């Protein structure tokens, strides 16, 4: 009985295995990841057909290459890499009014949480403030639509 009492008494002071919490380990290792959205405007600008005898399609002031440079520069500033990732080919359809102003746009295909990308593209287009020479049918200005395909790719980098 005395031996059991001594063993219990000394066993109370011996430490068992200690548990290490996961948070202590993960505090020392931080992961840095950079996300970049790249896009290509290599596809030619396409015009929806006007149904008239002698159509003249809408043109961006400065031409197609200046339009692509401007939209590329504006999208670089407005696409938010922290909120979403985007991959694949999208169609940006621009609706040009009779007065040569951008009336609205449409981004296809529609994807889940695509409203964030649409918001950023809208901000880029507003900031670009595009001026167009309106389309005409037999010398009369008409509404027109222009389609530009954009190929998006999201890349992640470890720093």
Q: Which residues make up each language-model segment?
A:
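Charge-biased low-complexity segments
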Residues: 17-159
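Sec-dependent N-terminal signal peptides
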Residues: 3-13
